[in-house]
Amino acid sequence: MAAEGERQNLLSKHLERQVKILQSICKNDSEACNLLDLGYILEKNLFAPADSRKADSGPDPQLNFFPPFLTPECLALHYPFFLTTSIPPSCKGNRSGTDTYSQFCSRSSCLEDIPDPSEWDDSLGNVSLMAELKENQKLAPLEEDSPRTTAVDESKCSSKQSYSYPALTFPPQVQKILFDYLIGESQDPNDLDSEYKLAFTDEDLPQEGQAEKTKQRETLGAVATFGAVLLSIQRLFTHPVVIKNTQESLHYTFLHGFVRMVHLLTEVNLSEFVTFHGLTHRNRLNNPVQHRQLEGADRFDYILDTIYLYLVFAWQTAMDIWSQTIDEETERNLRERVKSLKPELAGANYAEACSLVSNTVFPPLLREALVVNIPDFVNQTQLANFRLFINNKSNVPASVCPALPSDFIPLTYEESHPVLWAHVMLLRLAAFLLNHGQYVQAPDESSISLPLCDCNLCAPHRMPCYNPMLLNEILSIGKFEVRGPDTEGKGFSLTPQVFANAYMEKFYSEDFHPHQVVLYKDDKAQFKTEPTAAVIREPKLLALIRESQTRREKSILKRGGGRYLDPQTGEVLGESSHGIGEELQDGPSYGEKPSHDLPSYGKQNPVAGRGLQAAGERVRRDAGSPSQPTEQLGRRTPQRGGTGRDKRGRGRGGRSATPDPRQETAEKESLQGTRRESS
């Protein structure tokens, strides 16, 4: 009751503050009540008030903001559990130049078998040391180390013994049930002298001899501690839809591939959009291209670590969603189901027991529900803060020590203690996703003639260099307008926003290889679907538009010499078929134009969601295209409903960003493209 009263009190204070703000606005601004954009009113009066004098009627509600750069505690409440243990000598930081590291970096498949937990050795192994190790030194300076890892091993972390790994477990309620029925009932910390009750007594186990019974108890303890959750993680993250969604989200995170192409054509930065529990947020303070400033091993390590943290964050988000749905009745039913497994578990081996427990506590129905809702769109700033949070918990001062969380994780199961196998799995999956998404190979320059990405999401269908019809369509953006016989009827023009919405839906599941690295540039025979344009699917119509455009430009040039400017746009005719095709840079010069000055889509803003179904329907209505959308792997249409305790995780994308009405006119003018040719 006390907690309920406290929540009501906090809600009352919040509502009281909002009422004070609105009352003060309506009193001082006569136009406020007539305006429809409440967000603009609050922005105008909170961040740029006309009268900044101090009020005499108590604390100013406008100044009740969260302290800058202070991490909110609600972030820690998301999943604040850590596993603090000794750093294994076989960690990634001690494997430079070894065959294990080379095989790890070139991973081309995400499907693998998990060995028996009794087969492991996390010793340093055969490595080329630069100097003799000190007593209890965990990180060894190696001859093949990069400058970053050398700094970490030799000076910054030479005496570090342990690290805090973010927890990769089931929700606490589920984990406690497994411990109670597979290991033994939890003891009261104040009553440790009482007799400990084992989950499986000697009479419950069919094995002969005390040694065999003890071994079976250890096996079931391993299943409860890490075996069942390890199998559940593997089943979730190797699901084809999750791999597709993860790669799509990582393209947003790194402004990579087709997301980079949209930015090149429309100057809209989709990496500003992030999602969490079904709501879409826009944050303009993110820098999505900082990884392009790195080279060699540093670039590989940074991208690998970012993807690893992304997977950790995705699993913890899924467990957070699941945890909130577990009520007393659900917990009671789960206890009964796990208890009913005991006769089968008593005689099962490790693999069989893991499968039984995982199928019970993490059934296919739950897995399918999570598949369509994770992972979220996450930007690099979020993951950088997550990295800092983990290092702070591990006593690693990030300002002077360039250590990454992935440096402390072994590369194979055989070289790791089983309690870290979940981290080994996610790190190995991160290496596969890195190669599968071609993030390290991204070019520094941006041009429609360059392969910005060779992954299955982009090549060949979304890359103009591999898709001639798509290239012709891009060169026709803003170059024509089609009208019907009725002059007052609605016409069609291929605008950047119409093209972008259709372009982002351009995905063919039959050409997507989720479990293997199959690149179009290396093996074209593996791709069956013929590349087409995004909006104008009829090749003859597209060719006619391009021919008409070229013929008109040649006709203009025949009238005389010199340079001819388009009277509407000022474009130099005859020098470039379309301004979009020019070589543009968005690498080191990304920060020359602040992201908040970039034009948005106005009323057709692209949503950072899976497949952009709603946007695609709008494109087809505008274009009048009879083509049907292709069947896609991905999520359901983003929901616009609330996200209360009973609704969290049900929708994707949520609300799209609302454009600023003060910039709407300028945005429309900036997206007009070049001149239009009437029929």
UniProtKB/Swiss-Prot annotation:
Top-level taxon of origin: Viruses
Molecular function as annotated in GO: RNA binding
Modification Phosphotyrosine, positions: 252, 564
Post-translational modification: Might be cleaved by the viral protease.
Pfam family, one: Adeno_100
Function: Protein that inhibits host translation while promoting late viral translation by ribosome shunting. Blocks host cap-dependent translation by binding to eIF4G, displacing MKNK1 from cap initiation complexes and preventing EIF4E phosphorylation. Binds to the tripartite leader sequence of viral late mRNAs and recruits host eIF4G, PABPC1/poly-A binding protein and 40S ribosomes subunits on viral mRNAs, allowing ribosome shunting and efficient translation of late viral mRNAs even though conventional translation via ribosome scanning from the cap has been shut off in the host cell.
Name of the gene: L4
UniProt family annotation: Belongs to the adenoviridae shutoff protein family.
Keywords: Chaperone, Eukaryotic host gene expression shutoff by virus, Eukaryotic host translation shutoff by virus, Host cytoplasm, Host gene expression shutoff by virus, Host-virus interaction, Inhibition of eukaryotic host translation factors by virus, Late protein, Methylation, Phosphoprotein, RNA-binding, Translational shunt, Transport
Region of interest: Binding to host EIF4G: 178-232
Native organism: Snake adenovirus serotype 1
InterPro entries attached to this UniProt entry: L4
Protein name: Shutoff protein
Leftover remarks: All late proteins expressed from the major late promoter are produced by alternative splicing and alternative polyadenylation of the same gene giving rise to non-overlapping ORFs. A leader sequence is present in the N-terminus of all these mRNAs and is recognized by the viral shutoff protein to provide expression although conventional translation via ribosome scanning from the cap has been shut off in the host cell.
Principal cellular location given in the protein's record: host cell
One term under GO cellular component: host cell cytoplasm
